[in-house]
UniProtKB/Swiss-Prot annotation:
Top-rank taxon, per record: Viruses
Catalytic EC class: transferase
Protein's name in the database: RNA-directed RNA polymerase catalytic subunit
Ranges of Polar residues composition bias in the record: 55-64
Annotated region described as Promoter-binding site, given as residue ranges: 249-256
GO biological process, one term: viral transcription
Localization annotation: Host nucleus; Host cytoplasm
Gene name tied to this protein: PB1
Subunit structure as annotated in this protein's UniProt entry: Influenza RNA polymerase is composed of three subunits: PB1, PB2 and PA. Interacts (via N-terminus) with PA (via C-terminus). Interacts (via C-terminus) with PB2 (via N-terminus); this interaction is essential for transcription initiation. Interacts (via C-terminus) with human PKP2 (via N-terminus); the interaction competitively inhibits the interaction between the RNA polymerase subunits PB1 and PB2.
The keyword Phosphoprotein appears for this protein: yes
Gene3D superfamilies from the UniProt entry: 6.10.140.720
Length: 757
């Protein structure tokens, strides 16, 4: 049957059709090859925007650095990074005037966090540049390697596990004349395989010690590794993102904690909230502007876009902001917070893997590592690459480019939001002192600006003033990409507003479908996604019912678990049919065991096992949920698990789903081949961390989790906890005297062992 697609939209208001224009179905584009070219683009662009700044040379590393702060005022609309210090400080002062005590209170909150945060905070996060191996590693491993090397060099402040002590080590490490590090190297040798008698190449990974001179160490500590951002939709060109090393991470964390605390108190900030909370904040600002624009005033909204936000921001400006925000605070606190921007003013961008060359007849492939780009003959490269390399050469040191201006993506989202909000704050009538005034929203580099004025000229004047104010703070509103509408229709962080928010359903499309964790989790996540979209995204009952049927179909094809009475033949159908035939109550079988689907849109909140429990045969119940069954996952499954779902923009978000432990909640085993590589030690470390953390959680269930006070090791904390719990259990009669004695004996043994060690 042919359907004329326009018919679908006859009943739909135009704004609701927005979701059909989004590039969110199908696989997103991924990058291949190296990010070297993209990184060079970033470095060169950043310097171009600030080209009229002052050049200096870093005394420690010898890197040339460009400082655009207080540079020339713009004469045209081209993007520039010349922020004016006095303007930024004044904007901060006005922000504080409008919100009395905001900086003071945020500083106090942050101070508390600084004193309490443990160093394991740095194990969160994905890939981190590991300066000891000069490549990316999982965060926990990179931290472990850093601490190991610090110990090797006599730095032990981090033993107590406070992040602030680890940061003291970082500062001390910068003063050392040389640092000894442990790094890996590969040995290849040909050996005869016993089984097949063929020759094979065996790779062994050795660890060797190496000394780094002060200059080399400081360069590594200031290095951000770069990669290509993957899975970005709606873009033709890829772009580079950065991952900092462990020396920078902790300092950034504290700065962002302070900035987050400030953002939480600002009604114009789109961070750190999200989802419905963000929509409510937004709606409030719009309501305020609409209500105040009585019949006498016009109100217009700009859906704003800034040109190259990161590349025009400047760490020196952030330093000025922090200096102002913390001006009445203790010296140590001000120092800790000012280190991150100082390190970023001296950062180096690693150029990644370098370039791959292939000879015409495809026989030879060779890689030119980034380290060689400073000296190689340029005739091998095409024109555009040659230009890039020529431009970047003066900035290169050991395969990294000196990049003083600019911020790299996603490093100081909160702090840059504070800067943006400070301009929105200046739009109040008492500050503009004219007929026009403005307000709006800021979320990192995205903004919406609402301008009110008696007439069109006033609106234009207000927009111009906003634009110029932004320029003074190093923010470049793009006149080409921003557009203006009557207030009531605009877009902000992919939320579309038209007299209220329009559900942009296409954004959620990537999270529908089978996640591929295991049969139990996938069923649960699938129905939870549908449920959540009915609540939050205008997914109507008919569409939800259809989504559910499609999901069940998808699920059955993924796990080859078609109904027991189906004609479809798969590898599992023989077993499933056998089970179907010997089951009395067929409705009780889980979908993954060939049972029927009992879900409809009314019962999506109930886990499948619970939904069907009463319908199950007794022996099926026993097999499915028997903890003695070796196939029932022995991990203690919390009643709520977290899945990672991919919304179309922003980071992957976690979503809670109900988890019931059955034979279907298996955890796949790791691929064995990792055990023969350099990663093996890392894997063992990871497992050890995991075991220690699990054990610790057993002693301190989240409900009673108090941070161990004072400087006690994990073991000491657990032993003292065990003693307290045992005493309470003994006195209340929950355990016998013998058990109590046994526990006390074990605790003493552990302490003796620690003393001997």
């Amino acid at each position: 049957m042919d359907v004329n697609p326009t018919l679908l939209f006859l009943k739909v208001p135009a704004q609701n059709a927005i979701s059909t224009t989004f590039p969110y179905t199908g696989d997103p584009p991924y990058s291949h090859g190296t990010g070297t070219g993209y990184t060079m683009d970033t470095v060169n662009r950043t310097h171009q925007y600030s080209e009229r700044g002052k050049w200096t040379t870093n005394t420690e590393t010898g890197a040339p650095q460009l400082n655009p702060i207080d540079g020339p005022l713009p004469e045209d609309n081209e993007p520039t990074g010349y922020a004016q210090t006095d303007c930024v400080l004044e904007a901060m002062a006005f922000l504080e005037k409008s919100h009395p005590g905001i900086f003071e209170n945020s500083c106090l909150e942050t101070m508390e966090v600084v004193q309490q945060t443990r160093v394991d905070k740095l194990t969160q996060g994905r890939q981190t540049f590991d300066w000891t191996l000069n490549r990316n590693q999982p965060a926990a491993t990179a931290l472990a390697n850093t601490i190991e090397v610090f110990r090797l060099n006599g730095l032990t402040a981090n033993e107590s596990g406070r992040l602030i002590d680890f940061l003291k080590d970082v500062m001390e490490s910068m003063d050392k004349e040389e640092m000894e590090i442990v790094t890996h190297f590969q040995r290849k040798r040909r050996v005869r395989d016993n089984m097949t008698k063929k020759m094979v190449t065996q790779r062994t990974i050795g660890r060797k010690k190496q000394k780094l001179h002060k200059r080399s160490y400081i360069i590594r500590a200031l290095t951000l590794n770069t990669m290509t951002k993957d899975a970005e939709r709606g873009k033709l060109k890829r772009r580079a993102i950065a991952t900092p090393g462990m020396q920078i991470r902790g300092f950034v964390y504290f700065v962002e904690t302070l900035a987050r605390s400030i953002c939480e108190k600002l009604e114009q900030s789109g961070l750190p909230v999200g989802g419905n909370e963000k929509k409510a904040k937004l709606a409030n600002v719009v309501r305020k502007m609409m209500t105040n624009s009585q019949d006498t005033e016009l109100s217009f909204t700009i859906t704003g876009d800034n040109t190259k936000w990161n590349e025009n921001q400047n760490p020196r400006m952030f330093l000025a902001m922090i200096t102002y925000i913390t001006r009445n605070q203790p010296e140590w606190f001000r120092n800790v917070l000012s280190i991150a921007p100082i390190m970023f003013s001296n950062k180096m961008a690693r150029l990644g893997k370098g370039y791959m060359f292939e000879s015409k007849n495809m026989k030879l492939r060779t890689q030119i590592p980034a380290e060689m780009l400073s000296g190689i003959d340029l005739r091998y490269f095409n024109d555009s690459t040659r230009k890039k390399i020529e431009k970047i050469r003066p900035l290169l040191i050991d395969g990294a480019a000196s990049l003083s201006p600019g911020m790299m993506m996603g490093m100081f989202n909160m702090l840059s939001t504070v800067l943006g909000v400070s301009i929105l704050n200046l739009g109040q009538k008492e500050y503009t002192k004219t007929a026009y005034w403005w307000d709006g929203l800021q979320s990192s580099d995205d903004f919406a600006l609402i301008v009110n004025a008696p007439n069109h000229e006033g609106i234009q004047a207000g927009v111009d003033r906003f634009y110029r104010t932004c320029k003074l703070l190093g923010i470049n509103m793009s006149k080409k990409k921003s557009y203006i509408n009557r207030t009531g229709t605009f877009e902000f962080t992919s939320f579309f507003y038209r007299y209220g928010f329009v559900a942009n359903f296409s954004m959620e499309l990537p999270s529908f479908g089978v996640s591929g964790i295991n049969e139990s989790a996938d069923m649960s996540i699938g129905v939870t996604v549908i449920k959540n979209n009915m609540i939050n995204n205008d997914l109507g009952p008919a569409t939800a019912q259809m989504a559910l049927q499609l999901f069940i179909k998808d699920y059955r094809y993924t796990y080859r678990c078609h109904r027991g009475d189906t004609q479809i033949q798969t590898r599992r159908s023989f077993e499933i049919k056998k089970l179907w035939d010997q089951t009395r109550s067929k409705a009780g079988l889980l979908v993954s065991d060939g049972g029927p689907n009992l879900y409809n849109i009314r019962n999506l909140h109930i886990p499948e096992v619970c939904l069907k429990w009463e319908l199950m045969d007794k022996d099926y119940q026993g097999r499915l949920c028997n903890p003695l069954n070796p196939f029932v996952s022995h991990k203690e499954v919390e009643s709520v698990n977290n899945a990672v779902v991919m919304p179309s923009h922003g980071p992957a978000k976690t979503m809670e789903y109900d988890a019931v432990a059955t034979t279907h909640s298996w955890v796949p085993k790791r691929n064995r081949s990792i055990l023969n590589t350099s990663q093996r030690g890392i894997l063992e470390d990871e497992q050890m961390y995991q075991k220690c953390c699990n054990l610790f959680e057993k002693f301190f269930p989240s409900s009673s989790y108090r941070r161990p006070v004072g400087i006690s090791s994990m073991v000491e904390a657990m032993v003292s906890r065990a003693r307290i719990d045992a005493r309470i259990d003994f006195e209340s009669g929950r355990i016998k005297k013998e058990d109590f004695a046994e526990i006390m004996k074990i605790c003493s043994t552990i302490e003796d062992l620690r003393r001997q060690k």
